[in-house]
UniProtKB/Swiss-Prot annotation:
Matches recorded under InterPro entries: IDEAL_dom (IPR014957), UPF0302 (IPR011188), UPF0302_N (IPR014963), UPF0302_N_sf (IPR038091), Virus_scaffolding_prot_C (IPR027393)
Record-stated family: Belongs to the UPF0302 family.
Protein name (database record): UPF0302 protein Lm4b_01938
Gene3D superfamilies: Uncharacterised family UPF0302, N-terminal domain, Virus Scaffolding Protein, Chain A
Superkingdom field: Bacteria
Amino acid sequence: MKASISIDEKKDFIRWFLNKHQMKTREAMWVLNYIAGHDQIVKYVHFVDNLEGCARGLSLSAHGVESEPFLFFKGNIMTTDPEKAFHDIRLNWDEELYVELHFEEAMSSPEYALVREDNPFTAVKLADEEKEMADALIYQSVHQFSREKVLQQIDEALDTRDEAAFHKLVRILQQMDTEKE
């Protein structure tokens, strides 16, 4: 997840987006212009790839893509009425608003990438191969850390001339090395 995106970056993106893309409904353009004109609202706006799990979301589409032109939802209530969405955004300006934009080449747009955030409500899904790689990395890191700790304790046993501790730690180290193979 990237660092916080500034209000100015979000406003610049909205202006760029509206200049570059024609919305399927003019009300979508009005809502985006309203948002861009109010820093206190922009502060709570998050551009995401999907609205799954979000408590309050706005899905807008530009011409050239096959998506609903305008959807707003809050909790379990969903509407295609821009007036209701505008009213909620205006009155509840201090609530998080997740915005999903559908437009041509959205995923390859550097402007969109700059403001896009991970949806905090969507679980990260890893393929089995990725899970195995992550597990192997964790195991290797833990093993390396443990081995270094035992080596440090062996050095301390040598420094204090503690022969019993030294032999015990060498056996532990040998056992760790055999288990790794």
